[in-house]
């Protein structure tokens, strides 16, 4: 249910001919709009930080994809692909090493460049 604050609702209306955000939090268009907005923000932030000091490393520890996308609009494969982050460290928590290795493999399959994981 992230994104229903007044500022985000105003930004959504601006981008959508005055329309209010969908009431259904799982609306595909709403999730896509929020993810695009977050992707643009992270790209701008990354560029500004790198302009100040190119040596700074931009990292993030999102929850697993696609859960991160559906629930928090965190599309971390796009962040890696677009160069908005230098590397990511997905939050993967399992009680057995087999479960962990399986989930890590799934997360790696989401990335074109696994060296940034």
Language-model features: where?
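Catalytic beta/alpha-barrel core
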Residues: 91-97
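Structural preference for beta-strand elements that scaffold enzyme active sites
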Residues: 55-59, 86-89, 116-117
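Polysaccharide-binding and catalytic clefts of secreted carbohydrate-active enzymes
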Residues: 1-82, 94
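Surface-exposed substrate-engagement region within the catalytic domains
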Residues: 82, 97-117
